[in-house]
Amino acid sequence: GSDPTPLAAVSFGGAVFFILFIAAIGIALGMTPLVGELYAQGDREKSAGLLQNGILFYTLLGFAMAAVQYAVIPLMYDLGQPVEVVDMAIPYYKMLVFSMPFVMLFFAFKQFLEGVGNTKVEMVVTIIANMANIGFNAVFIYGRFGLPEMGAEGAGLGTLLSRIIAPILMIGYFYNRHKYRGYLDGFSPRNYSWATVKNLLHMGLPISMQMFLEASAFVGTGIMMGWFGKETMSANQIAVTIGNCAFMIVMSIGAATTIRVSHCYGARNIGELSLAAKASYHLVLAWNAFAALVFITMRNIIPTFFSTNPEVIAIASQLLVFAALYQLSDGIQNVSVGILRGIQDVKIIMPIAFVSYWLLNLPVGYLFGFTLGMGPTGLFLGFSFGLSAAAVMMIVRIRRSVRKLRLGN
């Protein structure tokens, strides 16, 4: 359609939700390298302890995060967005908030399975949940089968229901697979061990902070886009959606890197570890070069799938060119984070993220976008600076850490 309000509302509601959502997910990601190391060493008992504590701790964390996210609702009017956008965003946002504990329960199982090198199950579960989400959206947004037309709120309800389905499927899988049922044996809140939780936090918090800082740079840029008006906000949503499609592949390469590297690290096989790291860099560079090419050559065509508004399409096509610019550094920094997680060298990624995203990305984007008057594309230029800085600093760190591991061997 040509009315930019619903798209802007979903964009804004999603952006506000995303910041704390990503922080919670980051904490859960800390489980994978720990499980991966134990898996390489064949320690089932400790792995079971990690899973069981993860289930309890992450779900509780999900409730806590949801409470915080609910509390910030009144502040959504203070971010300089058009009032009708915020009005439509809040019911959608509430549905997302209710999904938090279910997301975290799902992630406890997902990160554990990744640690033991099983990524197929999460893929199947995610595909089923996404198909369900699409079906729910068709029903709730447009009000099929005699249900009321819910619009943006319906999109939120569809997401909530699909996020409840995912952990239920995971639990079913674990109980029906002899190989995995043992990990849940004797599961009770009594097994809650503060030492294990501290271990999970020790790995998870720096990852969480890095993801929070990175996400807030993207969200901060999105909020500044809103200052240019609804059309720019919608165009930004299009560019970010397309960017996320490319980024999904990057994220999966990063996650696979963590799994491979953590297994090599657990077996103390540094030669294999270096090979895995190099292969990941080659993969991600090839993919991101391809993505950048598509962004540039298809820049006038892609936005027409999302909007019929000529102004929105024009802005989005410019943004895609600038999104192409930061593809390579985004890929490199993501794989680098994957390697650092795998060798459990995560403390450093937080300060690197702080410098890259808050001291470079956001200020440089503001400088080009507003001070130097480049407009929306100037904001995207900030990403090139921030992501490139992150990529360089992380590579320097990895070279140092791998050299240390070699000497340690």
Residue ranges and their predicted role:
Residues 1-8, 76-83, 139-150, 212-245, ...:
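Helix-terminus/linker motif at the lipid-water interface of multi-pass membrane proteins
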Residues 4-15, 89, 93, 156, ...:
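Small-residue hotspots at the loop-to-helix junctions and early N-terminal turns
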Residues 7-66, 70, 103-122, 222, ...:
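Small-residue-rich hydrophobic transmembrane alpha-helices
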Residues 20-24, 64, 97, 101-102, ...:
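Residue-level hotspots within pore-lining transmembrane alpha-helices
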Residues 25-28, 96-114, 122-130, 155-171, ...:
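Short runs within selected transmembrane alpha-helices of multi-pass transporters and secretion channels
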Residues 35-101, 147-205, 261-326, 368-409:
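Short alpha-helical transmembrane segments in multi-pass integral membrane proteins
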Residues 74-75, 108-112, 131, 135-142, ...:
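Alpha-helical transmembrane segments of multipass membrane proteins
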Residues 95, 129, 162-166, 170, ...:
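Transmembrane helical elements of multi-pass membrane transporters/channels
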